């Protein structure tokens, strides 16, 4: 079964071979070895603020000869309570694909259930699959492989952590989540990652950031308070301060380690400016790769290649 016409709601929806197919295409699109003509219309429904995801999806479809419609919920009937089922069925008659950024994974899944076009997860509270595809592309660019590497994620066991668990497992890369005990990833997602990884990679949940960073090839962090968690910010700062990605922690990693952050970054909170702007940071390449990875996703789901 190919990817054309499929949804991308979580990386667990894909086989390892399909993840590799997306990443291979993303690399050839970036290098210019492959060009894709995809004169399709992509709709964006974003209930949360966005810079990289909104712009990279828009640029991706337009650079392939398509067009984008920004369907802000506040200026559509969705914002006035029209059922998702009705909206999804109607938009399927006008558009070729939907990229949706919303809070509840359940809402995204409802869109996918009723839509007759591909629905892409542009971030929910549970998952951020397109971000992790760009992350994996960045890692491969730097190391030429994923096997025998270890990625350590420092911070909240959130949507990014969940998708890193699944994505690393899909490509056979060891993954460690270093987090306070009260902020662990969901057990069902950890179990799914372990199932996918099998004996190809190790999936670990640790609470000691120093031990977790020891010998790692990739150190990765994210903001401590995500959108909608602002009231918890003070408690989160207290809990996550030991997990700050700073030079001392970076020195525990492999000498050739790279630093990733999905952005936006709060300097001197989850990451120091020294590390973010340092020679081992690949954050800006990582952000660029959102464009190439999402071009690959769109091209494959829309049957353009």
UniProtKB/Swiss-Prot annotation:
Carbamoyl phosphate binds at residues 50-53, 77, 101, 128-131, 262-263, 290. PROSITE patterns: CARBAMOYLTRANSFERASE. GO terms for molecular function: amino acid binding; ornithine carbamoyltransferase activity. It holds the Pfam family OTCace. Pathway: Amino-acid biosynthesis; L-arginine biosynthesis; L-arginine from L-ornithine and carbamoyl phosphate: step 1/3. One of its GO terms (cellular component) is cytoplasm. Its EC number is 2.1.3.3. It is an enzyme of class 2 (transferase). It is found in: Cytoplasm. InterPro entries: Asp/Orn_carbamoyltranf_P-bd (IPR006132), Asp/Orn_carbamoylTrfase (IPR006130), Asp/Orn_carbamoylTrfase_sf (IPR036901), Asp_carbamoyltransf_Asp/Orn-bd (IPR006131), Orn/put_carbamltrans (IPR002292), OTCase_ArgI (IPR024904). It catalyses: carbamoyl phosphate + L-ornithine = L-citrulline + phosphate + H(+). L-ornithine binds at residues 159, 222, 226-227. Keywords: Amino-acid biosynthesis, Arginine biosynthesis, Cytoplasm, Transferase. This is Ornithine carbamoyltransferase. It comes from Synechococcus elongatus (strain ATCC 33912 / PCC 7942 / FACHB-805) (Anacystis nidulans R2). The lineage of its organism: Bacteria, Bacillati, Cyanobacteriota, Cyanophyceae, Synechococcales. The gene is argF.
